[in-house]
Amino acid sequence: VMSGAVDQNDRNTAILFGDGAGCVVIGEVPQGYGFQSFVLGADSAGGPHLYLRGAALRLPEGTEMGPHLTQNGREVFKFAVRTLGDSAEQAMRQAGMSTADIDWLVPHQANIRIIEAACERFGLPLERAVTNLERYGNTSAASIPLALAEAESQGRFRDGDQLLLAGFGGGLSWGAAAARWWAGP
């Protein structure tokens, strides 16, 4: 839930974020389906570009300093375009995939320009990226689970589709996974 972390007077962040929650239930799937690779990373040198100010501070009782998200949009954008693509490529290599194998890109819903840059890098039309940013804004850690749930409920995924999930976040951190969709019994 981002509304409590965003300073509503900060035009650099207030208009970008939405509230959301999501989860993914992981269970046994037939051989050849499910997650095929994971990539996770972090680089604390980028921490000053995206962080929750005051989140880890113990303040005296009565002190009014709510934790607020602080970001350097230009630096976060450059980081996101680079690491989203790099980590997604690494996840594909680990899974033995190429960009031609991708049926759907399911990216973190931070900024449509970042998603467009990822599609361009992988030679995918934007229609092959699951997006809901225009409806909900950046829902932070909920964005990929929400995108998965929405696409599945719309019947967009077919049994055996190759999904490439990729995201990034505060700190600065990143992750990607390749998965083969199982439509279930």
Language model features: what each stretch is:
Residues M2-Q8:
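Glycine/threonine-rich beta-strand-loop-alpha-helix active-site module
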Residues S87-A95, A147:
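Stable alpha-helical structural segments in soluble proteins, enriched in small hydrophobic residues
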Residues M2, A42-D43, I112-R113:
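Short, catalytically relevant binding-site loops at active-site mouths
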Residues V81, G85, D103-P185:
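Claisen-condensing/thiolase-fold acyl-transfer catalytic domains that form or cleave C-C bonds
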